[in-house]
Amino acid sequence: MIAPQPIPRTLPRWQRIVALTMIGISTALIGGCTMGQNPDKSPHLTGEQKIQLIDSMRHKGSYEAARERLTATAQIIADRVSAAIPGQTWKFNDDSYGQDFYRNGSLCKELSADIARRPMAKPVDFGSTFSAEDFKIAANIVREEAAKYGVTTESSLFNESAKRDYDVQGNGYEFNLGQIKFATLNITGDCFLLQKVLDLPAGQLPPEPPIWPTTSTPTP
């Protein structure tokens, strides 16, 4: 079954913004690969180095738990924005591709997707775009909540009526408030081990994932 891959962290930032904001067409931006394909095989790490890296990450908890925490933070931000800006509403993106990206997350730099991923909060769609002043209010709320994760490096690529963007990064996290045709909030976390990897004993590499056949099995 064709499904979106985790978003590569090497994708230029403006492309990631478009991919997340225009979530319905984002499979075209990353190639529409299957989850069975894995472009990040960590060729620069030896097996022992991978084991050491994996074990050093165990204290952080699981990818799945981190994803839930980020989604809770996204809801806090969205609720605060709606309360601060009269008439503004929000909802979690319920598009099937948006849900796929939420489940799959983004690729880590040094570990493959069957070992660890960067969690993504459920994407937030706001009910209307922001005026210049309202965007400042929303960005300030994002700034305050991001700071709780130690995320403080701010930047902006666009600041005009057609396109607005506020981005804050740090500690492996990224919070992005942006609007092109509609306004969205996207949060990506640091690299976390999958729960199935945490469940394995320390000091060893997880088993290689199964290789799925490329052709379907005929039905009797």
Swiss-Prot record:
Keywords for the protein's UniProt record, in alphabetical order: Cell membrane, Lipoprotein, Membrane, Palmitate, Signal
Localization per record: Cell membrane
Domain of life, source organism: Bacteria
Keyword presence, Cell membrane: yes
Gene responsible for this protein: lppB
Record Pfam families: LppA (PF16708)
Family classification: Belongs to the mycobacteriales LppA/LppB family.
Lipidation (S-diacylglycerol cysteine): C33
Stored InterPro entries: LppA/LppB/LprP (IPR032018)
Lipid-conjugated positions (N-palmitoyl cysteine): C33
Biological classification of the source: Bacteria, Bacillati, Actinomycetota, Actinomycetes, Mycobacteriales
UniProt membrane topology term: Lipid-anchor
Protein name (Swiss-Prot/TrEMBL): Putative lipoprotein LppB
Gene3D superfamilies tied to this protein: 3.30.2030.20
CC terms in the record's Gene Ontology section: extracellular region; plasma membrane
Span of the signal peptide: 1-32
